[in-house]
Curated annotation (Swiss-Prot):
Pfam families: ASFV_360. Plays a role in virus cell tropism, and may be required for efficient virus replication in macrophages. Keywords: Early protein. GO terms for biological process: taxis. This is Protein MGF 360-16R. Belongs to the asfivirus MGF 360 family. It comes from African swine fever virus (strain Badajoz 1971 Vero-adapted).
Length: 311
């Protein structure tokens, strides 16, 4: 049951107020100040998202109650952790990113089940397997800059994430930090399953994600996202074509790269190299004629493919 004080704070947070009320709000505990935020805490009347500052609506500015709680735990803001938990935030999510003994004790006192061992990995996998916008965003917020993953087998974790994302997240396993790997993982899962709310959130919160967003759009054959990413990302058309050819039936990605000037003969050979014969025939329809090179390449792979090419 909510306390009278909790209900009163919720009532105040859902109403409009002027700057003259700011001193009262600070005393009342409805103020959030950190390196990026400094303003009154509000609850959106339309979606119940948490807003900080002067915004008439929460679009682009709000965060769910769970996300607000996770961020408060990471900042070790005891009063806000208590406030958001009282308002209905899931303190179990907070416990997953409580990196100090004092915050772990606080989360436990508020009802969280202390996570141990594989619970961290199980939570990461669960939040991505639900294929839900909110769970992907929660997963990103919980495990971004979370030192609890320092104790896991990083090579094994990187391989697992790459297999689940279905798109190469890095060139080599030792050439990317875990933080960046996880950011790419959450983004790739959102693009792969067309979770538009999560994509929009990551576009606004993950720094320098645009080059990888173009790679995802090419790999998952999304011409609209390719066009959007190409406005801000300058990638060589042949590199774009190489990405497009890695997944079979990527006709729109191949055609987009071809229109930008990619070598269609090289695309034909790359498609054959990756074993994507539908892509190869599409390249031939676009004018590719590297049959001699393709025959030699196919001969190294399978004799049956060689015969098929030469027939």
């Amino acid at each position: 049951m909510l306390s009278l004080q909790t209900i009163a704070k919720m009532a105040v947070a859902t109403n409009t107020y002027s700057k003259y009320h700011y001193p009262i709000l600070k005393v009342f505990g409805l103020w959030w100040k950190n390196s990026t935020l400094n303003g009154p805490i509000k609850i959106c009347n339309h979606c119940n998202n948490i807003m900080v500052g002067e915004y008439p609506m929460c679009y682009n500015h709000g965060m769910s109650l769970d996300i607000a709680l996770i961020r408060a735990v990471k900042e070790r803001n005891i009063s806000l952790v208590q406030l958001f938990t009282e308002w209905g935030g899931n303190i179990d999510y907070g416990a997953l990113c409580a990196n100090t003994p004092s915050m772990q004790r606080l989360c436990k006192s508020l009802g969280a089940k202390p996570p141990k061992g594989r619970m961290y990995m199980d939570a990461l996998i669960h939040l991505s397997d639900t294929l839900n916008d909110n769970d992907l965003i929660r997963g990103y917020e919980i495990f971004d800059d979370n030192s609890v993953l320092d104790c896991v087998n990083l090579i094994r974790l990187k391989i697992m994430l790459t297999l689940k994302a279905r798109i190469p997240l890095m060139e080599q396993l030792d050439q990317i930090a875990l933080k960046q790997l996880l950011q790419r993982y959450w983004y790739a899962m959102a693009v792969q399953h067309n979770l538009t709310t999560a994509i929009h959130y990551f576009d606004n919160h993950i720094p320098n994600i645009k080059p990888f967003s173009l790679r995802c759009a090419l790999y998952f054959n999304d011409p609209f996202k390719i066009h959007d990413a190409c406005r801000t990302v300058n990638m060589d058309p042949n590199e774009m074509m190489n990405i497009a050819c890695q997944q079979d039936l990527n006709f729109q990605s191949i055609y987009y790269s071809y229109i930008l000037g990619a070598d269609i003969n090289q695309a034909m050979l790359m498609s054959l190299k990756y074993g994507n014969l539908s892509n190869m025939w599409f390249c031939i329809d676009l004018g590719a004629d590297a049959f001699k090179e393709a025959g030699a390449l196919a001969g190294k792979k399978k004799k049956s493919v060689t015969a098929h090419i030469r027939s």
